[in-house]
Amino acid sequence: INTITFDAGNATINKYATFMESLRNEAKDPSLKCYGIPMLPNTNSTIKYLLVKLQGASLKTITLMLRRNNLYVMGYSDPYDNKCRYHIFNDIKGTEYSDVENTLCPSSNPRVAKPINYNGLYPTLEKKAGVTSRNEVQLGIQILSSDIGKISGQGSFTEKIEAKFLLVAIQMVSEAARFKYIENQVKTNFNRDFSPNDKVLDLEENWGKISTAIHNSKNGALPKPLELKNADGTKWIVLRVDEIKPDVGLLNYVNGTCQAT
């Protein structure tokens, strides 16, 4: 498994763009494309996981583990007390659990578990972060960098601090890889913190639906109008692939052939 690294403590817009490109290239199925948009592999791919190593200020690091077929964050590790400390969401079970444990922290090295006692779904993370919506949790390179420092190597931290970090990391890594619109929000607001707007939240919640609609399009027209949201929360009706294509970085895997590659 290749590790993609991003130094948030020493970042530029170009470095973030390169990180996004590397992540999409590692994740995508090289043989699948739909209307020019790369697609993630199905669950049978040989390489099932991806590692993303994030570095914050003063060389603190956290490594995220992603499921390759949907970019879902399964857990993370950090160096703690000269050991590899791994943190796995409580909805990861069975063989996947041991895969995450052994990939984040190979058994040849001393390791210690610090479980995440909740799942990785947005409503859960929002509740643990003490917010009613994740639009209350600001995103930004500086925030990502300082959040890494609040967890990496620390003897203790609250669930609130952890959930906030996870909300920031999931959106700035996985969601930004899925959606160029979200990547561009990070780039536009690069030197300041920002709240994710209504379009960001809506895209995040409709990635599967958007992927299926694009995949099932005929001659560039969606099977039926897709009702999404603009940045200001107003209704955005999408009729054609071209209208949403600039916002999409990766499609979720959809079975069957796509009319246009």
UniProtKB/Swiss-Prot annotation:
Q: What is its EC number?
A: 3.2.2.22
Active-site residue numbers:
175
Task: Tell me the domain of life.
Answer: Eukaryota
Covalent S-S links between cysteines: 34-258, 84-105
Q: Name one GO biological process term.
A: negative regulation of translation
What this protein catalyses is:
Endohydrolysis of the N-glycosidic bond at one specific adenosine on the 28S rRNA
Q: Keywords, A to Z?
A: Antiviral defense, Disulfide bond, Hydrolase, Plant defense, Protein synthesis inhibitor, Toxin
Q: Name one GO molecular function term.
A: toxin activity
Q: Does the keyword Hydrolase apply?
A: yes
Family of this protein? Belongs to the ribosome-inactivating protein family. Type 1 RIP subfamily.
What is the recorded function of this protein according to its Swiss-Prot or TrEMBL entry? Inhibits viral infection of plants, and protein synthesis in vitro.
- Name of the protein in its database record: Antiviral protein S
Could you tell me which species this protein originates from? Phytolacca americana
